[in-house]
Amino acid sequence: MKSIIYICPSAKNKPTGGIKIIYRHVELLSNLLPKGTESKIFHFENTNFKCDWFPHKVNFKKNSTFDSSKEFAIIPEWMAVYHAKILQNQNVKYGIFVLNGFYIYKKPKNNFTNLDIYEAYKKAEFILSCADEITEGIKLTFPEFKEKIVRVNISVDSRKYYCSKEIFEKKENLITYMPRKHKNNSEILLYILNRHLPKNWKIKSVDNLTELEVANIFKKSKIFLSFSELEGLGLPPIESALCGNHVIGYTGEGGKEFWNAPIFDEVFSGDIRTFAKKVIDKVTDFEKNGYIFNNFKPYIDKLADKYSVEKEKSSLSSLIEQIKNF
Protein backbone atom coordinates (compact mmCIF):
# COMPACT_ATOMS: atom_id res chain seq x y z
CA MET A 1 0.00 0.00 0.00
CA LYS A 2 1.35 3.40 -1.01
CA SER A 3 1.25 6.57 1.06
CA ILE A 4 -1.31 9.10 -0.19
CA ILE A 5 -0.04 12.61 -0.88
CA TYR A 6 -2.49 15.46 -1.46
CA ILE A 7 -0.93 18.29 -3.48
CA CYS A 8 -2.28 21.54 -2.07
CA PRO A 9 -1.82 25.30 -2.61
CA SER A 10 -1.47 27.73 0.27
CA ALA A 11 -4.12 30.21 -1.00
CA LYS A 12 -2.17 32.89 0.90
CA ASN A 13 -3.42 31.31 4.13
CA LYS A 14 -6.92 32.73 3.59
CA PRO A 15 -10.03 30.70 4.52
CA THR A 16 -10.85 28.46 1.55
CA GLY A 17 -13.35 25.61 1.61
CA GLY A 18 -11.44 23.42 -0.84
CA ILE A 19 -8.27 23.52 1.24
CA LYS A 20 -10.18 22.69 4.41
CA ILE A 21 -11.68 19.66 2.63
CA ILE A 22 -8.22 18.48 1.51
CA TYR A 23 -6.79 18.82 5.02
CA ARG A 24 -9.78 16.96 6.42
CA HIS A 25 -9.28 14.06 4.00
CA VAL A 26 -5.60 13.78 4.93
CA GLU A 27 -6.42 13.87 8.63
CA LEU A 28 -8.99 11.08 8.36
CA LEU A 29 -6.92 8.97 5.96
CA SER A 30 -4.00 9.04 8.40
CA ASN A 31 -6.16 7.14 10.88
CA LEU A 32 -7.56 4.72 8.29
CA LEU A 33 -4.40 3.67 6.43
CA PRO A 34 -2.54 0.49 7.45
CA LYS A 35 0.69 0.73 9.46
CA GLY A 36 3.71 1.81 7.47
CA THR A 37 1.74 4.10 5.17
CA GLU A 38 0.80 7.74 5.63
CA SER A 39 -1.31 10.49 4.20
CA LYS A 40 0.35 13.89 3.85
CA ILE A 41 -0.19 17.41 2.56
CA PHE A 42 2.35 18.66 0.02
CA HIS A 43 2.42 22.46 -0.19
CA PHE A 44 4.46 22.72 -3.37
CA GLU A 45 4.86 26.52 -3.16
CA ASN A 46 6.42 26.36 0.30
CA THR A 47 7.06 23.00 1.98
CA ASN A 48 7.29 24.70 5.39
CA PHE A 49 3.83 26.26 5.09
CA LYS A 50 0.75 25.06 6.99
CA CYS A 51 -2.71 26.61 7.33
CA ASP A 52 -3.38 28.23 10.69
CA TRP A 53 -6.94 29.51 10.30
CA PHE A 54 -8.47 26.21 11.45
CA PRO A 55 -7.21 23.46 13.78
CA HIS A 56 -5.86 20.27 12.21
CA LYS A 57 -3.63 17.30 12.83
CA VAL A 58 -1.99 16.49 9.51
CA ASN A 59 1.45 15.42 8.37
CA PHE A 60 3.34 17.32 5.70
CA LYS A 61 5.58 16.16 2.88
CA LYS A 62 8.76 18.23 3.09
CA ASN A 63 10.72 17.07 0.03
CA SER A 64 9.64 17.93 -3.50
CA THR A 65 10.52 14.61 -5.16
CA PHE A 66 8.07 11.72 -5.30
CA ASP A 67 8.84 8.03 -4.92
CA SER A 68 6.76 6.19 -7.53
CA SER A 69 7.06 2.91 -5.63
CA LYS A 70 5.83 4.32 -2.31
CA GLU A 71 3.65 7.36 -3.02
CA PHE A 72 0.34 7.98 -4.76
CA ALA A 73 -0.57 11.62 -5.50
CA ILE A 74 -3.94 13.35 -5.51
CA ILE A 75 -4.20 16.70 -7.31
CA PRO A 76 -7.01 19.27 -7.03
CA GLU A 77 -8.57 19.94 -10.42
CA TRP A 78 -7.61 23.60 -10.72
CA MET A 79 -3.91 22.68 -10.87
CA ALA A 80 -4.22 19.20 -12.37
CA VAL A 81 -2.69 19.88 -15.78
CA TYR A 82 0.53 21.36 -14.37
CA HIS A 83 1.22 18.73 -11.71
CA ALA A 84 0.03 15.82 -13.86
CA LYS A 85 2.86 16.53 -16.32
CA ILE A 86 5.45 16.50 -13.53
CA LEU A 87 4.08 13.29 -12.00
CA GLN A 88 3.90 11.58 -15.39
CA ASN A 89 7.58 12.37 -15.95
CA GLN A 90 8.39 10.77 -12.59
CA ASN A 91 6.16 7.72 -13.30
CA VAL A 92 4.09 8.56 -10.22
CA LYS A 93 0.48 7.37 -10.34
CA TYR A 94 -2.12 9.98 -9.44
CA GLY A 95 -5.79 10.79 -9.13
CA ILE A 96 -7.54 14.11 -9.67
CA PHE A 97 -9.83 15.49 -6.95
CA VAL A 98 -12.50 17.65 -8.60
CA LEU A 99 -13.74 20.01 -5.89
CA ASN A 100 -15.40 22.30 -8.41
CA GLY A 101 -16.58 20.86 -11.71
CA PHE A 102 -16.49 24.32 -13.27
CA TYR A 103 -12.69 24.48 -12.84
CA ILE A 104 -11.87 21.43 -14.95
CA TYR A 105 -10.80 23.69 -17.82
CA LYS A 106 -8.20 25.55 -15.70
CA LYS A 107 -4.61 25.57 -16.91
CA PRO A 108 -1.54 27.82 -16.58
CA LYS A 109 -1.48 30.63 -19.13
CA ASN A 110 1.77 29.59 -20.80
CA ASN A 111 2.93 26.34 -22.40
CA PHE A 112 -0.26 24.34 -21.78
CA THR A 113 -3.11 23.48 -24.15
CA ASN A 114 -6.60 22.02 -23.92
CA LEU A 115 -5.06 18.73 -25.08
CA ASP A 116 -2.85 18.79 -21.97
CA ILE A 117 -5.99 19.02 -19.83
CA TYR A 118 -7.42 16.00 -21.61
CA GLU A 119 -4.19 14.05 -21.17
CA ALA A 120 -4.10 14.86 -17.45
CA TYR A 121 -7.53 13.26 -16.98
CA LYS A 122 -6.85 10.43 -19.41
CA LYS A 123 -3.75 9.34 -17.49
CA ALA A 124 -5.29 9.76 -14.02
CA GLU A 125 -6.05 6.46 -12.28
CA PHE A 126 -9.34 7.86 -11.03
CA ILE A 127 -11.27 11.13 -10.74
CA LEU A 128 -12.68 12.00 -7.33
CA SER A 129 -15.99 13.84 -7.00
CA CYS A 130 -17.59 15.12 -3.79
CA ALA A 131 -20.95 16.31 -5.14
CA ASP A 132 -23.69 15.28 -7.57
CA GLU A 133 -23.18 18.43 -9.66
CA ILE A 134 -19.46 17.69 -9.94
CA THR A 135 -20.08 14.12 -11.04
CA GLU A 136 -22.47 15.25 -13.77
CA GLY A 137 -20.01 17.95 -14.86
CA ILE A 138 -17.21 15.40 -15.25
CA LYS A 139 -19.49 13.09 -17.23
CA LEU A 140 -20.51 15.95 -19.51
CA THR A 141 -16.93 17.10 -20.11
CA PHE A 142 -15.29 13.67 -20.33
CA PRO A 143 -18.01 11.04 -20.95
CA GLU A 144 -15.30 8.55 -21.95
CA PHE A 145 -13.86 8.71 -18.42
CA LYS A 146 -17.10 8.22 -16.48
CA GLU A 147 -15.95 4.80 -15.23
CA LYS A 148 -13.02 6.51 -13.52
CA ILE A 149 -15.25 8.63 -11.27
CA VAL A 150 -15.08 7.76 -7.57
CA ARG A 151 -17.56 9.49 -5.27
CA VAL A 152 -16.18 10.60 -1.90
CA ASN A 153 -18.05 12.34 0.88
CA ILE A 154 -17.11 15.48 2.71
CA SER A 155 -18.13 16.30 6.26
CA VAL A 156 -18.87 19.38 8.31
CA ASP A 157 -17.54 19.25 11.86
CA SER A 158 -20.63 18.84 14.05
CA ARG A 159 -18.55 19.67 17.13
CA LYS A 160 -18.22 23.23 15.82
CA TYR A 161 -21.26 23.72 13.60
CA TYR A 162 -24.38 22.80 15.56
CA CYS A 163 -27.45 24.36 17.12
CA SER A 164 -28.82 23.40 20.53
CA LYS A 165 -32.05 24.74 22.02
CA GLU A 166 -29.98 27.03 24.24
CA ILE A 167 -28.10 28.47 21.24
CA PHE A 168 -31.36 28.87 19.35
CA GLU A 169 -32.99 30.83 22.17
CA LYS A 170 -30.03 33.23 22.38
CA LYS A 171 -29.98 34.05 18.67
CA GLU A 172 -29.95 37.72 17.73
CA ASN A 173 -31.85 39.55 15.00
CA LEU A 174 -28.81 39.17 12.82
CA ILE A 175 -28.30 38.45 9.10
CA THR A 176 -24.88 37.22 7.98
CA TYR A 177 -23.19 36.93 4.59
CA MET A 178 -19.74 36.41 3.07
CA PRO A 179 -18.60 39.28 0.80
CA ARG A 180 -16.02 37.43 -1.32
CA LYS A 181 -18.49 36.12 -3.90
CA HIS A 182 -20.72 38.25 -6.16
CA LYS A 183 -19.56 41.44 -4.46
CA ASN A 184 -21.65 43.71 -6.69
CA ASN A 185 -24.78 41.64 -6.04
CA SER A 186 -24.25 41.78 -2.29
CA GLU A 187 -23.71 45.56 -2.28
CA ILE A 188 -26.97 46.15 -4.17
CA LEU A 189 -28.94 43.75 -1.98
CA LEU A 190 -27.58 45.19 1.27
CA TYR A 191 -28.52 48.72 0.23
CA ILE A 192 -32.10 47.60 -0.46
CA LEU A 193 -32.35 45.60 2.77
CA ASN A 194 -31.06 48.46 4.87
CA ARG A 195 -33.94 50.54 3.51
CA HIS A 196 -36.53 48.00 4.65
CA LEU A 197 -35.31 46.04 7.67
CA PRO A 198 -36.72 46.86 11.12
CA LYS A 199 -34.31 48.89 13.25
CA ASN A 200 -33.78 45.95 15.60
CA TRP A 201 -32.22 43.86 12.79
CA LYS A 202 -28.56 44.04 11.75
CA ILE A 203 -26.47 42.69 8.85
CA LYS A 204 -22.93 41.44 9.48
CA SER A 205 -20.16 40.59 7.02
CA VAL A 206 -18.24 37.38 7.77
CA ASP A 207 -14.79 37.53 6.23
CA ASN A 208 -11.17 36.62 6.99
CA LEU A 209 -12.05 34.93 10.27
CA THR A 210 -10.92 31.66 11.81
CA GLU A 211 -13.19 28.65 11.56
CA LEU A 212 -14.18 28.97 15.23
CA GLU A 213 -15.00 32.67 14.86
CA VAL A 214 -17.22 31.91 11.86
CA ALA A 215 -19.06 29.17 13.76
CA ASN A 216 -19.68 31.48 16.72
CA ILE A 217 -21.17 34.19 14.49
CA PHE A 218 -23.39 31.67 12.69
CA LYS A 219 -24.73 30.57 16.08
CA LYS A 220 -25.84 34.15 16.75
CA SER A 221 -27.49 34.87 13.38
CA LYS A 222 -30.91 33.82 12.13
CA ILE A 223 -30.50 34.29 8.38
CA PHE A 224 -27.55 33.61 6.08
CA LEU A 225 -27.38 35.18 2.63
CA SER A 226 -25.72 32.91 0.09
CA PHE A 227 -23.88 34.54 -2.81
CA SER A 228 -22.30 31.31 -4.04
CA GLU A 229 -20.81 31.47 -7.51
CA LEU A 230 -20.39 28.35 -9.67
CA GLU A 231 -19.20 25.90 -7.04
CA GLY A 232 -18.83 22.20 -6.46
CA LEU A 233 -20.19 22.11 -2.94
CA GLY A 234 -19.98 25.38 -1.04
CA LEU A 235 -19.50 24.81 2.69
CA PRO A 236 -20.78 28.10 4.21
CA PRO A 237 -24.48 27.47 3.41
CA ILE A 238 -24.23 24.03 5.06
CA GLU A 239 -22.27 25.33 8.05
CA SER A 240 -24.66 28.22 8.65
CA ALA A 241 -27.71 25.96 8.34
CA LEU A 242 -26.28 23.52 10.90
CA CYS A 243 -25.97 26.50 13.25
CA GLY A 244 -29.70 27.18 12.90
CA ASN A 245 -29.81 29.75 10.09
CA HIS A 246 -32.46 30.07 7.44
CA VAL A 247 -30.39 30.21 4.22
CA ILE A 248 -31.58 32.36 1.33
CA GLY A 249 -29.77 32.83 -1.96
CA TYR A 250 -27.72 31.26 -4.73
CA THR A 251 -27.03 27.52 -4.72
CA GLY A 252 -23.83 27.78 -6.76
CA GLU A 253 -25.38 24.79 -8.62
CA GLY A 254 -23.53 22.28 -6.42
CA GLY A 255 -25.74 23.23 -3.49
CA LYS A 256 -28.85 21.87 -5.21
CA GLU A 257 -28.24 18.46 -3.64
CA PHE A 258 -29.08 19.83 -0.17
CA TRP A 259 -31.03 23.03 -0.92
CA ASN A 260 -34.34 21.90 0.53
CA ALA A 261 -37.13 23.71 2.37
CA PRO A 262 -37.72 24.78 5.05
CA ILE A 263 -34.09 25.61 5.85
CA PHE A 264 -32.99 26.62 2.33
CA ASP A 265 -34.69 29.04 -0.04
CA GLU A 266 -33.24 29.31 -3.56
CA VAL A 267 -32.82 32.53 -5.52
CA PHE A 268 -31.64 32.39 -9.12
CA SER A 269 -28.24 34.02 -9.51
CA GLY A 270 -28.58 37.75 -10.17
CA ASP A 271 -32.29 38.00 -9.28
CA ILE A 272 -31.78 40.77 -6.72
CA ARG A 273 -35.46 41.79 -6.47
CA THR A 274 -36.59 38.27 -5.58
CA PHE A 275 -33.63 37.93 -3.20
CA ALA A 276 -34.59 41.13 -1.36
CA LYS A 277 -38.27 40.19 -1.20
CA LYS A 278 -37.53 36.73 0.24
CA VAL A 279 -35.29 38.18 2.96
CA ILE A 280 -37.79 40.90 3.89
CA ASP A 281 -40.63 38.36 3.98
CA LYS A 282 -38.61 36.01 6.20
CA VAL A 283 -37.74 38.80 8.64
CA THR A 284 -41.43 39.79 8.74
CA ASP A 285 -42.34 36.15 9.43
CA PHE A 286 -39.82 35.90 12.28
CA GLU A 287 -41.06 39.18 13.75
CA LYS A 288 -44.67 38.02 13.63
CA ASN A 289 -44.43 34.31 14.47
CA GLY A 290 -41.12 34.03 16.28
CA TYR A 291 -38.13 31.83 15.56
CA ILE A 292 -39.22 28.32 16.53
CA PHE A 293 -36.53 25.72 17.24
CA ASN A 294 -38.74 22.68 16.62
CA ASN A 295 -39.48 23.89 13.09
CA PHE A 296 -35.78 23.60 12.22
CA LYS A 297 -34.38 20.79 14.37
CA PRO A 298 -35.45 17.70 12.31
CA TYR A 299 -34.03 19.24 9.12
CA ILE A 300 -30.79 20.28 10.82
CA ASP A 301 -30.35 16.69 12.05
CA LYS A 302 -30.95 15.32 8.56
CA LEU A 303 -28.38 17.72 7.07
CA ALA A 304 -25.84 16.83 9.77
CA ASP A 305 -26.25 13.14 8.95
CA LYS A 306 -25.78 13.75 5.21
CA TYR A 307 -22.44 15.45 5.85
CA SER A 308 -21.31 13.38 8.83
CA VAL A 309 -17.77 12.25 9.61
CA GLU A 310 -18.97 8.63 9.56
CA LYS A 311 -20.08 8.90 5.92
CA GLU A 312 -16.83 10.62 4.96
CA LYS A 313 -14.76 7.91 6.68
CA SER A 314 -16.71 5.20 4.89
CA SER A 315 -16.08 6.77 1.47
CA LEU A 316 -12.37 7.22 2.25
CA SER A 317 -12.09 3.57 3.28
CA SER A 318 -13.41 2.70 -0.18
CA LEU A 319 -10.86 5.08 -1.70
CA ILE A 320 -8.04 3.25 0.11
CA GLU A 321 -9.23 -0.02 -1.45
CA GLN A 322 -9.04 1.65 -4.89
CA ILE A 323 -5.50 2.90 -4.32
CA LYS A 324 -4.34 -0.55 -3.18
CA ASN A 325 -4.69 -1.62 -6.82
CA PHE A 326 -2.07 0.91 -7.93
Where are the predicted features?
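Extended catalytic core of nucleotide-activated donor transferases of GT-like folds
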Residues: 46-123
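Conserved catalytic-core segment of nucleotide-activated headgroup transferases in glycan assembly
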Residues: 18-21, 134-141, 151-212
